[in-house]
């Protein structure tokens, strides 16, 4: 099911659909998360699902997907994560269709966002802009 947050639609992650977007020149952000992992939930509440970050995704025309790894038996999510060189969550890959499919990783440690949400958002947004605009 799609989830809309501040006007941004997060589609359920599907590797084939993501790669199709990339082939068409689109940049795809993937939120690898799980409901049982507090860091994931904190990052979403104080950084990823904020109006500032949503505006930046919209401004940069980024497709957003969520890979909910709450069920660790979901081998498709696990295999894709391992294929891109990651083994743990949270993980925030962005596949840059605008840069021939280059894969970059946005920071998973967004500072202690519960204490300094502005610092976490700034760090995330700055890195997102750097990857797309450089």
Residue ranges of each PLM-predicted region?
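Proteins that catalyze or organize thiol-disulfide redox chemistry
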Residues: 1-134
